[in-house]
Design a protein with these regions (language model features):
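Short, charge-rich, low-complexity alpha-helical interaction segments
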Residues: 131, 135-182
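Short, membrane-exposed interhelical loops at transmembrane-helix boundaries
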Residues: 69-76, 258-284
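Interfacial aromatic "cap" segments that immediately flank transmembrane helices
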Residues: 2-37, 115-142, 176, 189-238, ...
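Membrane-interface interhelical connector segments
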Residues: 160-169, 202, 206-210, 255-274
């Protein structure tokens, strides 16, 4: 099986953003909208009760009243809020499946059509299924690896105890460090071995989770290097944008709003008042987040489509 170029794969996401900026923007909006649906539904159905319960709780605390007063109403309201978590999980899987399929379609099957390469069909169903099953399987593997690491770590610790100091102390410290590193490395390795499942499933239109193990054989180290590059890139982009956001926030003279007294006074207002004041910031951050989610998702996922295309010698789009 062919090898792949880390540089070519790493640049695939940036290249796709440059070639299809409006598509990437649309993907971000769709991704954010789908993830926002359960939140909007929750506020529509539970929002008034939640604001009322929250207001009563804050008012009681401000008046130095009984800490338990209002807690029952608040707890009941929050239990209703938690019922939307399952719906949020499903819409998150749906959003990820749709956007992943759009990215893979732009990379591997550009003539497949769809609005901005977006569709809802069997490709998206397969992506959702592979995402769900892979997540469950990796979680099971991770638990087993952690349990094995705990057992090995325990053996090393008691071996160090038996040897006694000072050598025993070194055995315990170095042994436990090595065990933690081995545990983390094994989990990362498992994730990398399954990293071709999504693009392979999209390309073949069949469930390719376990076939990914064969596709990634002999490519673990290059995949690790690629994953590290992508991780550092995502963190760097988020860090720069975070600093820029704080710079804008401070330049507008809003630094005083972060003082403890200002924060306490802000939330001491009626919930509908402070929500109204915060709404422009929430909307602004949401819009920026929509744009960024499409870009970051593309930068993260397109490289794996490129890796798949290179190792299977599948044509990939460059237009």
């Amino acid at each position: 099986m062919a090898s792949f170029s880390i540089g070519e794969a790493y640049g695939a996401g940036f290249g796709l953003v440059a070639r299809k900026p409006f598509q990437v923007l649309t993907w971000g909006i769709v991704y954010s909208a789908l993830n926002l649906l359960p939140v909007l539904l929750m506020f529509w159905l539970v929002g008034p009760d939640m604001i009322k319960a929250w207001g009563e709780l804050i008012a009681n605390a401000a008046a130095n009243g009984d800490p338990e007063a209002g807690m029952e109403s608040y707890t009941q309201t929050m239990s209703r809020v938690q019922s939307f978590q399952a719906l949020g999980g499903l819409t998150s899987i749906l959003a990820t499946a749709i956007i992943n399929a759009a990215i893979f379609r732009a990379m591997l099957r550009p003539s497949d059509g769809g609005f901005m390469h977006l569709k809802v069909g069997m490709d998206e169903l397969w992506q959702g299924l592979i995402y769900l099953v892979a997540g469950i399987l990796i979680a099971i593997f991770a638990v087993l690896v952690v349990l094995a690491s705990v057992a090995i770590g325990g053996i090393v610790y008691f071996a160090g105890e038996a040897v006694g100091s000072p050598l025993g102390g070194w055995i315990k410290v170095l042994g436990l460090i090595a065990t933690v590193i081995a545990c983390f490395t094994t989990i990362v390795w498992i994730c990398l071995r399954f990293s071709m499942a999504a693009p392979a499933t999209f390309d073949t239109r069949t469930f390719q989770l376990f076939e990914s193990w064969s596709l990634t054989k002999g490519h673990s180290l290059p995949l690790l290097a690629l994953a590290l590059l992508l991780g550092v890139t995502i963190i760097a982009i988020q860090g720069v944008l975070g600093v820029a956001f704080l710079g804008i926030f401070f330049s507008l003279g809003s630094i005083e709003a972060l003082s403890p007294d200002s924060i306490e006074a802000f939330f001491a207002q009626a919930p509908d008042v402070w929500l109204g004041q915060a709404a422009p910031w929430i909307i602004g951050v949401g819009l920026i987040g929509s744009v960024l989610s499409g870009i970051l998702h593309t930068i993260l996922m397109a490289p794996f489509a490129s890796v798949y295309a290179q190792i299977t010698e599948t044509p990939q789009s460059v237009a």
